[in-house]
Structures are given as C-alpha cells and as structure tokens.
Design a protein with these regions (language model features):
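Secretory pathway targeting signatures of secreted, lumenal, and periplasmic proteins
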Residues: 34-40, 55-59, 69-74, 195-254
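Bacterial signal peptide processing site
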Residues: 21-23
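Signature of long, low-cysteine stretches enriched in small and polar/charged residues
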Residues: 75-82, 88-138, 142, 246-302, ...
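Hydrophobic helical h-region of N-terminal Sec-dependent signal peptides
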Residues: 9-14
C-alpha cells in the first residue's frame, strides 16, 4: 500500500510556488476531463483514461461518467484552470508538442523519473481551487498501461470524491427545502437534504412511502420503509423480487426492464446494502431511462429502507443528473432510533 501511494507522486515544485496564492474556483463541468496531448498520442492516452474511468451509465445507450475533451498542447494555457486536467505524452520525441509541454512543466529530474519509473503524477489545486491535475508521461504504451492496476481505484476515488464535493456545494448550499426536511425527521424518524426546486409528489408516510421530483429534466427520488428486517441481506433472489415489484406497486405506470439489470453488494453510507441499477420503461408510453436503487437494513432504527432514483431525459446526457440524485440519496440519515 505504501508503495502504491508512493507511485502517485506530487508536483511539489508547483505546490510550493502556487500554494500561497488565492486561487479562484476551478472552471468547467464536473463530468468533463480536459485531456491535453499531441495528436500522435491521442489513442494511447484515450485508452489509459478509459481504462481508469470505466464506469458507464446505461440509458439504455452507454453513457460514460466522464466525457473526454481533447485539446492540443497549444491550447493548454487557456484551459489550465479547468476542474479536471490531464496532460499527457508518450515517448521523448522533442518534436512532439506534448513532450515539449511536459518538459516545461516538470523539472528535468522529475521528467526523467516518470519516463523510467512511475509515469503518473497527480496533485490537487495546482492552478485553481478544487482542481485535480494529472500528468501522464510514459516511455511507451506498455509502461503506461502497466501502471493502471495499481492506481485505478485510488485515482477514481480522488475524482469521484471531488465530484461529490463540488456538486454538493452546487446543489445543497444555495437553498434547500428545510421545512420539508424537518417534517420528515419529526414524522418519520429520518431525513435527507432536498434541494430547492424539488417538489413533494406523494407523501404516504402512513404506509411508509415518500416521493419527490424535479422537472427539466424529470427526476424522481423515492423512499420506502418498513419496520424490522424485511429482506434477506444475503439472498439475491429475495432482493430481486423486492425490486421487480417496486415500480408497479408505488409508481403504477412504469416497470423495470431486464436489459443491463445489475445487482451488487456494497455499502450505503457505511451500512451494508444492495445496489441495483438498470432501465425503467413506461407501461403506457414509449418512455424510459436509467434507474438506481439501494436497499438496506438499519439496525439503529430497526427498519428496512429502499431508496430509488430514476430520470427521463430523452436524447440528452443523464449521468451527471443520476450522480446528483445519488448525492441526494446519500444525504439520507436516520434521526430517531429504537
């Protein structure tokens, strides 16, 4: 583990030079990677980025969590304050504009070290606040791709944590439906952060169901709960039956489809949970889109909870909205205990 962390080198010289400056907030979208490299290196750098950031939302068409925007080295100066910047080069050809750029960015000793040893350099807040900056400087494709297994999960965690930090500030800090949040806590013993613009579609707390939504695009988040441990946390068949019956029971006019249906064990806010994802479709109209659910038992409140999210946004990007809803769902917390 120590060795792996050592592989993620820090651009110390720039931190020393720039660390005392007051930096403005990083620019750009939270689902876009700015990748700066010369044309001959694009395919290799693309394969590296794709192999690290391989999470995909099926809508049902595949939609990556991060879009890749390639920029030639001469455009670097105008985009260096973007939120997610990757600067890459393969080989040491001094006529390669990407190599020229990296040689300007790195001290000679560090430049040679990346070619001979670890090809990845990573840091935070280099030119802007809440920025992630990655340098990829490899001698060859083989050297670069060989570095992926040791770094993949660590790098993904850095980027996903930064996404959560920046997006939480965007969706929660300006205004929230605090009165609804307080009512949920007092009435149901749990609450969650509800951003301004989200409306209560249905409050059936007497039977353990609460549903909020937002337009432009259409987004739904619902919570269903029951007293006691009503699921078998080990038996996937039991969870599957719970999921398949959910939309027709609580939404009535939609159902889940078996295309790209996926169930996996994991955690929801440090509680063991099932994570279920797939595609929903309307029973009445040609409509559909992605959904995501978490099912878990909370021992402190002695209740089983099911949080479900779905979106309808035909022909447009959906992944960033699904990830925003995931942040809303994960703001869920129990406020009353047994």
């Amino acid at each position: 583990m120590k060795k792996n962390h050592k592989l993620i080198a820090i651009l110390s010289i720039y931190i020393l030079l720039l660390g005392c400056e007051n930096k403005r907030e990083a620019l750009g979208a939270d689902n876009e990677l700015i990748v700066v490299c010369a044309d001959p290196d694009k395919d290799i750098i693309y394969d590296f980025v794709q192999s690290v950031f391989d999470d995909t939302l099926f809508t049902p068409q595949p939609e990556p969590y991060f879009k890749i925007r390639f920029v030639k080295p001469e455009g670097y100066i105008d985009l260096k304050e973007q939120a997610y910047v990757v600067v890459g080069a393969i080989g040491d050809d001094i006529h390669n504009d990407g190599v020229k750029l990296i040689k300007k960015l790195l001290p000679e000793e560090q430049y040679q070290s990346t070619l001979e040893n670890d090809p990845i350099l990573f840091t935070h807040d280099l030119y802007a606040s809440n920025q992630l900056f990655l340098i990829v400087n490899a001698k060859s494709r083989d050297q670069l791709m060989a570095s992926v297994p040791a770094k993949k999960e660590w790098l993904k965690n850095q980027y996903y944590s930064q996404f959560a930090k920046r997006q939480s500030k965007y969706i929660f800090e300006n205004a929230r439906r605090v009165e609804v949040e307080k009512e949920l806590s007092e009435k149901n013993g749990w609450t969650m952060k509800i951003p301004w613009g989200w409306e209560v579609i249905k409050d059936s707390s007497d039977v353990g169901f609460f549903w909020i939504g937002k337009e432009m695009p259409f987004q739904w988040v619902s919570i269903q709960w029951e007293d006691g441990k009503t699921i078998d946390v080990v038996d996937g068949l039991d969870i599957g039956n719970t999921i398949w019956s959910y939309p027709e029971t609580f939404y009535e006019h939609i159902r889940f489809h078996d295309y790209k249906f996926k169930m996996e064990k994991g955690y929801f806010n440090r509680i063991k949970a099932w994570k279920i994802s797939g595609i929903w479709e309307s029973i009445e109209e040609p409509q559909g889109g992605p959904f995501l659910s978490y099912i878990f038992y909370d021992k402190a409140s002695d209740k089983t909870y099911h949080l479900n999210m779905l979106i309808y946004h035909p022909g447009e990007d959906k992944s960033i909205f699904m990830r925003q809803m995931d942040l809303i769902a994960k703001s869920f917390r129990v406020t009353k205990w047994v």
